A protein has these predicted regions:
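Conserved glycine-rich Rossmann-like NAD(P)H-binding loop of the short-chain dehydrogenase/reductase
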Residues: 28-44
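Substrate-binding pocket helix/loop in short-chain dehydrogenase/reductase
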Residues: 97-99, 103-111
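Conserved NAD(P)H cofactor-binding loop of Rossmann-fold oxidoreductase domains
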Residues: 89-95
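Conserved glycine-rich cofactor-binding loop
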Residues: 14-16
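C-terminal helical subdomain
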Residues: 178, 182-183, 190, 198-235
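Catalytic loop of short-chain dehydrogenase/reductase
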Residues: 92, 130, 134-174, 187
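The beta1-alpha1 cofactor-binding region of Rossmann-like NAD(H)/NADP(H)-dependent oxidoreductases
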Residues: 60-71, 104
Length: 235
């Protein structure tokens, strides 16, 4: 029964790492709330979860919809009264190229989804996480957060700012049981990677499933430093 399970929220769960992580969590007897912009992708994820005997709830959501994020938090409270696990995975690559060529609207779209929507998630889920005795939050970042690589513009900037924001939130919660960590998944076979590196040999990349197993392993690890950044390739 769902009442006896931990409750997790996974954003960007319609494909890639988000989908694989949701499936992996469900296999650990966690009820997973899966969000994403594409309903068909969420339905595929849900079908895979059910096939393995797991349970999930679809909450179709565009991360640009900040009011929708708030509404999701309220619905989670009404239905379950708490949130045990938050996996913030949703992100967009945007347009790669020189900064001075990037249109403001394209730049802001990346910042909105990769950074500001995460602030809204923190606002909406903080109290719910603190109602749990388990209380874990994990944010997917990128190696580009620490590497000012040419032409990665808004994406790299958004991930660098995300890391800083999450570390601040972790510091603000150093005296309670809410565990907050950041993960750099490394080179993985995802849509974002394919868009950024067209023609790359996929065989040399990790699969989303391989990354998901390590993410879920970190979630159930008893001792991690708050605000710590984990490089999946080194785990």
């Amino acid at each position: 029964m769902v009442e006896n399970k931990k409750i997790a929220l996974v954003t960007g769960a319609s494909s890639g790492i988000g989908s694989a992580t949701a499936i992996e969590l469900a296999q650990k007897n966690v009820h997973v709330i899966i969000t994403g912009k594409t309903l068909s992708g969420l339905q595929v994820t849900e079908s895979k979860i059910k096939l393995d005997g797991g349970t999930s709830t679809i909450a179709q959501l565009d991360m640009n919809d900040f009011v929708g994020i708030d509404r999701l938090g309220m619905e989670i409270f009404k239905r379950w009264g708490k949130l045990d696990i938050l996996i913030s995975n949703a992100a967009v690559l945007g347009i790669l190229g020189p900064l001075h060529h990037q249109a403001s609207e394209d730049f802001f779209d990346v910042i909105n989804i990769n950074l500001l929507s995460n602030h809204r998630l923190i606002r909406s889920m903080d109290a719910l996480l603190k109602k749990s005795n388990f209380s874990k939050a994990l944010f997917l970042s990128s190696s580009m957060a620490s590497t000012p690589k040419s032409f990665w513009g808004a994406y790299a900037i958004s991930k660098a700012a995300l890391n800083h924001m999450v570390k601040i939130w972790a510091n603000e919660n150093k005296n309670n049981n809410l565990s907050i960590i950041i993960v750099n998944p490394g080179k993985t076979r995802t849509k974002i990677r394919a868009k950024a590196m067209p023609g790359e040999n996929e065989k040399v990349l990790q699969t989303p499933e391989e990354v998901a197993k390590k993410i879920v392993g970190l979630i159930f690890l008893n001792k991690v430093s708050k605000g710590e950044i984990f490089d999946i390739l080194q785990i």
